[in-house]
Curated annotation (Swiss-Prot):
This is Reaction center protein H chain. It comes from Cereibacter sphaeroides. The gene is puhA. It is a single-pass membrane protein. One of its GO terms (biological process) is photosynthesis, light reaction. GO terms for cellular component: plasma membrane light-harvesting complex; plasma membrane-derived chromatophore membrane.
Length: 260
């Protein structure tokens, strides 16, 4: 009979549950080590290696073939974000905030931080640039709401910094990503759509004062924006919510004094 000789004194239910536990432990180990292909080895906030690297070892390097002829990517690999960080410790122990040592918006630290992404445009599934200016995107137009093109752009100090000359759209997502603004000196900058408020007669940017618009990182091409440029632009404008706060407060104080 089955189970009398080979498994006469063995519980098959125990075999099943022990096998499941072994499989689950192996799955957890595999998923955790695969998750460590990016972001490891761990570092302190000043860039030095962290003392506690966790219980799992780094996985062996694996090479991925990138789509659209963009080469290969090996992770974990030798590539690292090796740029000077303009921050200084405020305490000896870890976990305390670091203080900027220069202009935090230009240095890209704190709320204005950016990640060293690839300096190439993001592509859609067909290998075309995802984000383009509307003047170069056939078939796109403002179908609803106020068209911001031609409107003046006002900073948080209530001063005019420039005017909107184009909208950059995400082709596959069919949504606006950036406003292209021409400054008073004739140069242009991109503003993230999430950081502007389109009003009936102007575009208001609460994050930046008018004198800070010239510091927005520029783009190399007038018809495309790279992943690195996107991150730098968004970091700079978002950082203004904190670093331009004194100018917003001074404007509010002046308005209150005027009506006092």
């Amino acid at each position: 009979m089955v189970g009398v000789t080979a498994f006469g004194n063995f519980d098959l239910a125990s075999l099943a549950i022990y096998s499941f536990w072994i499989f689950l432990a192996g799955l957890i180990y595999y998923l955790q080590t695969e998750n460590m292909r990016e972001g490891y080895p761990l570092e302190n906030e000043d860039g030095t290696p962290a003392a506690n690297q966790g219980p799992f070892p780094l996985p062996k390097p694996k090479t991925f073939i990138l789509p659209h002829g963009r080469g290969t990517l090996t992770v974990p690999g030798p590539e690292s974000e090796d740029r000077p960080i303009a921050l200084a410790r405020t305490a000896v122990s870890e976990g305390f905030p670091h203080a900027p040592t220069g202009d935090p918006m230009k240095d890209g630290v704190g709320p204005a931080s950016w990640v060293a992404r690839r300096d190439l445009p993001e592509l859609d599934g067909h290998g075309h640039n995802k984000i383009k200016p509307m003047k170069a995107a056939a078939g796109f137009h403002v179908s609803a709401g106020k068209n911001p093109i031609g409107l003046p752009v006002r900073g948080c100090d209530l001063e005019i910094a420039g005017k909107v000359v184009d909208i950059w759209v995400d082709i596959p997502e069919q949504m606006a990503r950036f406003l292209e603004v021409e400054l008073k000196d004739g140069s242009t900058r991109l503003l993230p759509m999430q950081m502007v408020k389109v009003q009936s007669n102007r575009v208001h940017v609460n994050a930046l004062s008018s004198d800070l618009f010239a510091g927005i990182p520029t783009i190399k091409s007038p018809t495309e924006v790279t992943l690195l440029e996107e991150d730098k632009i968004c970091g700079y404008v978002a950082g203004g919510l904190m670093y331009a706060a004194p100018k917003r407060k001074s404007v509010v104080a002046a308005m209150l004094a005027e009506y006092a």
